[in-house]
Amino acid sequence: MEFLSPLRYPGGKAKVADFVQCLIKENALLDGTYVEPYVGGGSVALSLLFNEYVRDIYINDKDISIYAFWYSVLHESEALCKLIKDTPINVETWHKLKDIQSNKENVDLLNLGFSTFFLNRTNRSGILKAGVIGGYDQTGNYKIDARFNKDDLIKRIQRIADYADRIHLSN
């Protein structure tokens, strides 16, 4: 399975993307619009868009942290990718970015979006309120960077940004 979303959602909707593609094709709905009211990682929407099953996708998420991430991907992708490239992946950074989630109203969308992304990639099961992979002392079987391949994640974000004119975001 090709991973399209930069976000981790184990047990998410990605596994139904092929089924939704089949539904669209069998019901002659190709080249239409797909609406995702709770986008999360957005794997189904991205699959439909990248494989040209739909012309446009409308994505929404009530959670301002998730919205901020997608806003950053679509409107500040270069700055987001620079943050990903330049930010060290360690527990000290994790604590700083975790604090941002407690003060969402006092931070701009780019920094909130990056915090959301960083925690999603470094927390157990991608859950924003969970603890760090490997534990605070990093003695677990997996370390904080186990799910954080910077080059691959930047490529995913850049690919999505290339479709920004066909992705409509709301909160």
Provide a role label for each language-model segment.
Residues 30-92:
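Conserved S-adenosyl-L-methionine
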Residues 1-24, 29, 73-171:
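SAM-dependent nucleic-acid methyltransferase catalytic core
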